[in-house]
Amino acid sequence: MSGGEQKPERYYVGVDVGTGSVRAALVDQSGVLLAFADQPIKNWEPQFNHHEQSSEDIWAACCVVTKKVVQGIDLNQIRGLGFDATCSLVVLDKQFHPLPVNQEGDSHRNVIMWLDHRAVSQVNRINETKHSVLQYVGGVMSVEMQAPKLLWLKENLREICWDKAGHFFDLPDFLSWKATGVTARSLCSLVCKWTYSAEKGWDDSFWKMIGLEDFVADNYSKIGNQVLPPGASLGNGLTPEAARDLGLLPGIAVAASLIDAHAGGLGVIGADVRGHGLICEGQPVTSRLAVICGTSSCHMGISKDPIFVPGVWGPYFSAMVPGFWLNEGGQSVTGKLIDHMVQGHAAFPELQVKATARCQSIYAYLNSHLDLIKKAQPVGFLTVDLHVWPDFHGNRSPLADLTLKGMVTGLKLSQDLDDLAILYLATVQAIALGTRFIIEAMEAAGHSISTLFLCGGLSKNPLFVQMHADITGMPVVLSQEVESVLVGAAVLGACASGDFASVQEAMAKMSKVGKVVFPRLQDKKYYDKKYQVFLKLVEHQKEYLAIMNDD
């Protein structure tokens, strides 16, 4: 500012709770990350398909990373705090103490994780009701949503958990409550995972029909009867106790939270794309699909009017971008699947030794090894006779069938490093083919998508990014800040502080294009063939099932 004092810089803290770690960032008004920290969190798997965490362990990790990113900063310059987290279920008693979600009665483990599939029987019964709320989750509710998990708790842990419970939080809402003492829920969590309607509120008939009439009787006090849009300022901001825990000042604005994938969408989808030669530059923001890819992947598309896509969650009003309807496709395991395939291979120990010797990650080494063995052909052509169906944890979208299994065809007796690298490539391609499958379902229902915006851990893998471009035939935009989910969380804090007039304004000013990866259109014919095989795989799996179940 000429002729006057420059305004002091304003900062925001974004906190992201993922599946295996908590991460935090200090972000400025331009969306630039100034400091970053991460801290692992514990996961328990007491039995198959049961995945649990501890809310106390998660909060402690939030405190560690937040203190780290604000070291050396004038705390008066920190204007807002935003949280995002996985859509896991936190259970507390009436005094806000943890309750066990396990048969062992261990109250420390009071979180049913998002990827937990214990409630298969319950979700099947819910889907048999054909209740009208199901049309807003693609016609079929997922076992990963909260209603089946709540029903499982009532039916299996009545005495030690259900009867004592006072509060059921989505994890993002637990964090904002812990920071402010305000039990209001985020519209994002309730609309996306709990069947809440932004227009009509809770549907009493649904909860009564599935056997959870308890919530209706207490006016939904246990699951949320005050609902705020993401980015809204909560109460009086950070409480003195939470401020001490986090190393911040009391009263700092705290935002109504987002689910982690939605924070990623917020962090990328509104970027200014001018000057990059992208077709979406002259198109509305509804032409963009945000793909948030980490342990699992979520595919976020927005529209001005509601679009109902079979097998794809939504439409959810204002669940990510205010004023827009959101459809959310997804794949239950992506990063986790790649790890599973690579780490389970006989050549994995050799890979570890060679990658360590080169000071590379195992995936950087595999990518360079693929370049070595591809010779004159494009790297993707190495899988001409190896094909993978990636639903090792069921299909979330667009088939919405949790009974589907993974498939690999084209295996040989070879178990060397070349074999591992090609299996890794085929797995990455299968995930990208799954994205194409989801896009085609969304476009058939009325979406018009031209550009992918990728973020999350897998977006740091150049092979993963290029395969998504080649297989979908669409350009892939990567953010200037690779930690887009944390930028999205910081956008929430910025909105809560009042420094921006709207979420849209904060999105536009805090998210920037870093790199664009264009599809290699000369390879289109090959990937069209791979896609035909991909669709045949699931068709054949269903045929095998029918044969084996035939009396």
From Swiss-Prot:
Database matches in Pfam families:
FGGY_C (PF02782), FGGY_N (PF00370)
Uppermost EC category? transferase
Pathway assignment reads: Carbohydrate metabolism; pentose and glucuronate interconversion
GO CC terms, sorted: cytoplasm
Determine if Transferase is one of this entry's keywords.
yes
CDD domains annotated for this entry? ASKHA_NBD_FGGY_D-RBK
**Keyword annotations for this protein?**
Amyotrophic lateral sclerosis, Kinase, Neurodegeneration, Transferase
- Catalytic activity line of the entry: D-ribulose + ATP = D-ribulose 5-phosphate + ADP + H(+)
Could you state one GO biological process linked to this protein? carbohydrate phosphorylation
Give the tissue specificity. Expressed in kidney, lung and small intestine and to a lower extent in liver and detected in cerebrospinal fluid (at protein level).
One GO term in the molecular function aspect is: D-ribulokinase activity
Q: State its Enzyme Commission number(s).
A: 2.7.1.47
Superkingdom, natural source = Eukaryota
The disease tied to this protein in UniProt is:
Amyotrophic lateral sclerosis: A neurodegenerative disorder affecting upper motor neurons in the brain and lower motor neurons in the brain stem and spinal cord, resulting in fatal paralysis. Sensory abnormalities are absent. The pathologic hallmarks of the disease include pallor of the corticospinal tract due to loss of motor neurons, presence of ubiquitin-positive inclusions within surviving motor neurons, and deposition of pathologic aggregates. The etiology of amyotrophic lateral sclerosis is likely to be multifactorial, involving both genetic and environmental factors.
Function, in words: Postulated to function in a metabolite repair mechanism by preventing toxic accumulation of free D-ribulose formed by non-specific phosphatase activities. Alternatively, may play a role in regulating D-ribulose 5-phosphate recycling in the pentose phosphate pathway. Can phosphorylate ribitol with low efficiency.
Q: Which family does it belong to?
A: Belongs to the FGGY kinase family.
> Per its UniProt record, what PANTHER family does this chain match?
FGGY CARBOHYDRATE KINASE DOMAIN-CONTAINING PROTEIN, RIBULOKINASE
Query: What protein is this chain from?
Result: FGGY carbohydrate kinase domain-containing protein
